[in-house]
Amino acid sequence: MNNIERRKEILDILRKSSSPVPAKQLAARFDVSRQVIVQDLAVIRAST
């Protein structure tokens, strides 16, 4: 999965969730580090 696909999935997960989703949980889901998720979230925030 590339960065763009992962970010789209992260955004979808966050939109569907009724409560906050920990970065650690997303990192485990996508098999990346928590720091990668934090960077992805920064990109998502900057683009919205």
Question: Could you say what each language-model-derived stretch is?
Answer:
Residues M1-T48:
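Short, basic/aromatic recognition patches that contact phosphate-bearing ligands
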